C-alpha cells in the first residue's frame, strides 16, 4: 500500500520564517519523521510530495527513508498510490485520485468538504503522520 504525503501544511504547520539574510526556515515535528519510518517498517511505501524548491525539506526528510518528489503540478504524479494526505487546493488532484484521503484538522474548508475525506485530529506539523500510524494499524486488515 502506497501513501502520498504533502509537505507544507501536513508535515509542517505551514509557517515560514525568513531570517535577515533572506533564508527560509520551516518547522517539522520529529515525531512525524519517526512515524514515517514506522510506516515503512510496517510495509507501506511512503512518497513525500512538495511543490517547494526549498532544499531544507529534502535535507530533513531524506532521513525518513521515504521517496521525495519535487512536483509543482500534483496532477502529474506518475506513481500509483492508494492513500493521500493533503491540506490545500494544490492537493486536490492528488487527493481525488486516492482511494482513501486524509487531511489535518486545520486544512482548508474546500479540502475538508471533498467526498470521502477523513479529517484527522492533528493539525499540520503537529503529529499528522503519528496519527496515521495509529489509524493504519487499526485499518490495516480492512485495506
Pin down the residues of each PLM region:
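Mg2+-dependent phosphoryl-transfer enzymes with acidic/Ser/Thr/Gly-rich catalytic loops
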Residues: 62-66, 74-143
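Alpha-helical substrate-recognition element adjacent to the catalytic core
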Residues: 1-73
